Amino acid sequence: MSTAQLLAPQLSSDEVLRVARLDADRAYRDLARFVIRIAQEPDGWHVDFDLKDAMARGGGPHYVIDPESGVIVTKRYEQ
């Protein structure tokens, strides 16, 4: 068995973004005021919803998502 066969398939950034957006939409409803940043890190996909207006109070959700299963490992809401 080759190494490639042993590795689990990784989710694409689009798939991960869909998971994060579904959860964020339930919590925040209007996501238009956020810029979304996504990066693959050693502990999973990091998806951050940051306010476009730096002077506004509050913030958006922040996620770490498992790259294989798409499960939200951690989430933090700033409101």
Language-model region placement:
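Long, terminal "pre-/pro-" and other extracytoplasmic accessory regions
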Residues: 1-79
